[in-house]
Structures are given as structure tokens and as C-alpha cells.
């Protein structure tokens, strides 16, 4: 008479925690395996990182050509002259929040061409 999987599961369910630990140790020794390796492999696929879809464009420093940076900020944000100047002078400052990757890269490129130091977060 052979033992079924259900009977084994019932027997393990009836065991105390210490008995289960001893059973696992005995199985590791008998079959030459490690229960920890199986757990690590099972946990691997759960760590899927989501790709970021919204980015913040941060003006880190204005560089040598302040006027060109102010013009680039005005054209990119639609701010008035005073608001754009205040934003540039308050660097490091967040210029735009929650923009797409393409928009963030485009904005970064135009500001860097004007001489600013820009970071996309």
C-alpha cells in the first residue's frame, strides 16, 4: 500500500513546528538539496521593477549664459519674464513635474544648449 500526497500533507499538517523543521533538515540531508535555494528562486520573479512614466525636470545650475537660460525657461514653461528669472535664480529648482520621458529629455536638451545644468528625476 502506497501513501498518497494527501496523506503526507495531512501528516505534515498534524506535526508541530519543531517536527516540521526536523523533517525539512532530514529531507535536505537525504536528497542533498537546500530548502533556502528553492525559496530564493521562487521569490526572484516577484521583484519586477515598474518603468517610470512621469519625470521631474530640475534646473541644477544656470551656467555662464543666464539670459539664454531664462529665454529657454520662458519658452518651455510659458512663464513671464519675471517668473522665469525668479525660477532660474532660485536654482536648484524643479521646472516641470510629471512630464513624459520624451518631454523631459527635450526640455533637458534645450536648457543644456542654453548653458544650464539640468537633471531629470
Curated annotation (Swiss-Prot):
Disulfide bonds: none annotated. GO terms for molecular function: mRNA binding; structural constituent of ribosome. SUPFAM superfamilies: ClpS-like, Ribosomal protein L7/12, oligomerisation (N-terminal) domain. GO terms for biological process: translation. Keywords: Ribonucleoprotein, Ribosomal protein. Pfam families: Ribosomal_L12 (PF00542), Ribosomal_L12_N (PF16320). The keyword Ribosomal protein applies. One of its GO terms (cellular component) is cytosolic large ribosomal subunit. PANTHER family: 39S RIBOSOMAL PROTEIN L12 (PTHR45987), LARGE RIBOSOMAL SUBUNIT PROTEIN BL12M (PTHR45987:SF4). Homodimer. Part of the ribosomal stalk of the 50S ribosomal subunit. Forms a multimeric L10(L12)X complex, where L10 forms an elongated spine to which 2 to 4 L12 dimers bind in a sequential fashion. Binds GTP-bound translation factors. Forms part of the ribosomal stalk which helps the ribosome interact with GTP-bound translation factors. Is thus essential for accurate translation. NCBIfam families: L12 (TIGR00855). Belongs to the bacterial ribosomal protein bL12 family. This is Large ribosomal subunit protein bL12. It comes from Pectobacterium atrosepticum (strain SCRI 1043 / ATCC BAA-672) (Erwinia carotovora subsp. atroseptica).
Amino acid at each position: 500500500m502506497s501513501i498518497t500526497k494527501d496523506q503526507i500533507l495531512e501528516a505534515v499538517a498534524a506535526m508541530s513546528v519543531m517536527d516540521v523543521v526536523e523533517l525539512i533538515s532530514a529531507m535536505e540531508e537525504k536528497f542533498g538539496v537546500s530548502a533556502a535555494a528553492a525559496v530564493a528562486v521562487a521569490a526572484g520573479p516577484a521583484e519586477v521593477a515598474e518603468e517610470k512614466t512621469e519625470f521631474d525636470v530640475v534646473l541644477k545650475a544656470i551656467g555662464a549664459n543666464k539670459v539664454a537660460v531664462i529665454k529657454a525657461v520662458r519658452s518651455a514653461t510659458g512663464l513671464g519674464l519675471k517668473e522665469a528669472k525668479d525660477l532660474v535664480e532660485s536654482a536648484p529648482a524643479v521646472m516641470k513635474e510629471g512630464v513624459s520621458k520624451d518631454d523631459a529629455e527635450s526640455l533637458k536638451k534645450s536648457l543644456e544648449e542654453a548653458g544650464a545644468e539640468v537633471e531629470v528625476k
